[in-house]
């Protein structure tokens, strides 16, 4: 059974470097049997490599603005990514990546870490560093959802619209 950890983000943009930091930690001291891919700010470039691995499980970790307190961690349903307003620094939306690989992967898990400061040349904030440490510490014994809560309307300022999907439409004007 192959498990792939895709770490996404830009280490030059403060808290958006959460994914790359996790990849560095795993490179220095691997946890469990994860194949770690540092997708950086263009994770779509790794689609072919992920497909070739035919992983049983793909865990995508990225700093994601969910409207929570900095450093909070939530599982986001991959089917909801496209319909949620999320700030992103990536070249392509992550739902594009998920759509490209979903037929070659047993299970796709998307783990968001709430950033505080995403700006060029800013340091990563302590709450996000701590959150990366929490994710790292759970990789070796990962079962099911890793012990992380799902993002739900009750846990964030999301509103539910349309087909029962979570969106951040009301937050568009606050950024």
Question: Where do the model's predicted regions map?
Answer:
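N-terminal catalytic or cofactor-binding beta/alpha core of small enzyme domains
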Residues: 1-115, 122-146, 168-175
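Short, positively charged low-complexity motifs
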Residues: 147-149, 155-166, 173
